């Protein structure tokens, strides 16, 4: 048994102890069984959260949503760092403009997410 599969088996056992349900589907990457957590998430013991899609269109939607979430996270991190730096010099006009751009980008991104879910 390889080291990766040993770790996967140990994580799978831990998931079962925590009340997860083993599913008949397998991870498309490592072929380990998938588990459904109590909160409804489907996870691979090796790779973490897995999204099960039934069609190519559904796969595109999931990928797009994941990318939008990642972009949103990056924007929020940048906004946080800019706001933190602004405490050092509250009158820095370039920093203020940068914060406004982050807020504008976040607003646009959220509108895209709302429109794409309709």
UniProtKB/Swiss-Prot annotation:
Superkingdom assignment: Archaea
InterPro entries attached to this UniProt entry: SSSCA1, UPF0148
NCBIfam families (UniProt xref): PRK00420.1-1 (NF001644), PRK00420.1-4 (NF001647)
Protein name (record): UPF0148 protein M1627_1409
Similarity comment text for this entry: Belongs to the UPF0148 family.
Pfam family, one: Auto_anti-p27
């Amino acid at each position: 048994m390889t080291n990766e599969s040993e770790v996967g088996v140990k994580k799978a056992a831990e998931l079962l102890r925590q009340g997860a349900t083993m599913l008949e589907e397998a991870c498309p990457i490592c072929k380990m069984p998938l588990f459904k957590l109590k909160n409804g998430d489907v996870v691979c013991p090796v790779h973490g959260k897995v999204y099960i899609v039934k069609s190519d269109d559904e796969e595109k939607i999931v990928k797009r949503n994941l990318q939008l979430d990642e972009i949103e996270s990056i924007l929020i991190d940048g906004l946080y760092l800019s706001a933190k730096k602004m405490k050092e010099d509250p009158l820095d006009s370039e920093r203020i403009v940068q914060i406004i751009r982050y807020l504008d980008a976040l607003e646009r991104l959220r509108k895209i997410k709302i429109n794409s879910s309709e």
